[in-house]
Amino acid sequence: RYGIASMAHTQTQAMVMGADEFAAENIETNNSNVETAYTAYYNVINAVNTFLVHINKNIPGLSEEKRTEMIAEARCQRALAYLTLLKCFGEYWKQDSPYGVCIFQDELVRDNQPRKRSSVAETYKLISDDLDYAIAHCEQQPADHYHMSSVFAKALKAKMYMAQDNYAEAARLAEEVISEAEAAGYGLESDYAKIFDEQFNSQEMLFAPYTANPSELMDSNWYMFSPGSLLKKVADDLVPDDETGGDIVIPNPGDGGDVVVPDPDGSSDGSASGDGGVVIPGGDGGVVIPGGDGGVVIPGGDGSDFPFFPGDEDVASYDKLYTWAYKGDAMNGIGKYNKLTPEMFYADSYYFMRLAEVYYIAAEAEARQGQYAKARTLLATVIERAGYTEDDVNAIADSDLLGEILKHKLCDMSNENLEEWFDLCRYNRKGGFESWTEDEKAELPSFRRYLLPIPKASMGANSLLVQNPEYVNQ
């Protein structure tokens, strides 16, 4: 996932083997990260198929209702694995393509069995069948969000339809999920930071694995990396226009002393707010802020963004949501991943799907069908917590709406579940970048290839496996 984020330019090159190949969109067939991911998803499929063999045996004390529910959750996990494999390694956007993935439905993945790739249509058929079973038989109201529910299965199928460019069905299912969410125990968090503090316990989480201190946790390497050029540019451009205070001018402190930041809502000395401005301790002159011609200019916000820390560029003027997505509150790295263990290590879960993503799916799907009023209502709901009002959303022109939906989704959801890459590829294929500025477009990937290569080791172990056309000569 780190490599995919590098490829999407939502994260700088990760400190993992071969990540530079992702950033350059020039991935070798022997890339170790690609091989690890490919193998890992088939390990999930193998585990599911093994479980399905044994769960159908006579197990004392197991009711048929519980057996069916467990089968449904297992099949939902298999659907998630196959959908991810197809989107990473198959021509998922072409319904008539022969380049799906190798399917193991009722048998185990072992012994290097030669296996042809199934077509894209055949792969989608298996995914759809598994999800339909999960929608019908998974728990409706799970006590824990680390279990797959019927609502999650339906949300995952909406995502599947977006991959197929089937916007009508994507919108229909996504809006069903939204209408059913509250009764099933899901909801948007009003505080964005709470999502990543509560992790799999957040009401917004449709599915995230159980990871808990002290013995079961997942290292949060995201925090160690930095947002990519595309994410930073989009976040910069989404900072609302200043309407209240103008630019904030910090007087040059000269040699030492405190730096006094005038309150942008009041007079230059901060008297309107009664607090005398915002003070950044200067001590013996150790706080160095370039003064230029006598003052330091920081782009203005609404007067409520301080205190901030020197050196964080213009992070102080971000809305709360995009502050966390972009840089964090005076943090380096991807600040939403800030969960600490008692041993002071960063640890987190893996956020496979949040309810917010369902709103973005529905909003984009409606906009692509020309249903702009519906799209605006959906977008306004999910970005309200970032400080955007219904009036802000209504001011977006129809021709700009698709582009704005993606910008907000990038800031909200990048560096979580690979989806930003697939979103960018869809916009490149189907349109939506037209309203972006030239500076924003300059930060987009080149889209040389939409897919990853089938790993060289897998090709060598399976005589019937065919490489993706873009990588045949590598």
Predicted regions and their residues:
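Hydrophobic-face positions in mid-chain alpha helices that act as interaction patches
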Residues: 171-258, 262-269, 274-286, 291-355, ...
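Short coil/linker segments at helix-helix boundaries
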Residues: 65, 88-125
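Conserved, well-structured interaction surfaces
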Residues: 14-89, 118, 136-141, 345-350, ...
